[in-house]
Amino acid sequence: MEPTKEPTMEEKLQAVIALCEEGDPEMCAFLGKEFYYGWNVPQDLDRALRYLTVAAENGDAISQFTLGFMYWSGRGTEPDLDKAYELFLQAAEQDVPEAMYNVAKILLTKGFEKNRDEAMGWLRRSANAGYDAAYDMLSDLKDAGAGN
């Protein structure tokens, strides 16, 4: 009897792609991160955007956060602050501290419909969840007289 041949990395990748294309959002989230960061595959932001979108639409909070960052920064897509806000908010509502922080930053951004009280609430939630940057921003705002 022949020993079982271990699948190659390419064969494993093709199997995961097939699962994603069959509608498995967890596999799409996995692929999105692999292509976004270039882990085990060449970095491909177009493919990352495609796979992360599927996962985000299926409620994956980390995919929502990563996709939000792509739209906020214009990395792999055209910048879209409204879309970034929507995605960060979805992730924040699932308790992703970095997303809470980014929701607050967008709410405090010049040119975006400002809601200071809501922004402060998201900053507090993010800081309480242990996100140091949110704590630092709250401290800076308080020092500037804006965080009361």
Language-model-detected regions and their locations in the chain:
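Alpha-helical tetratricopeptide repeat
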Residues: 10-13, 17, 25-33, 53, ...
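Short helix-capping/linker turns of helical repeat alpha-solenoids
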Residues: 22-25, 37-39, 57-60, 73-75, ...
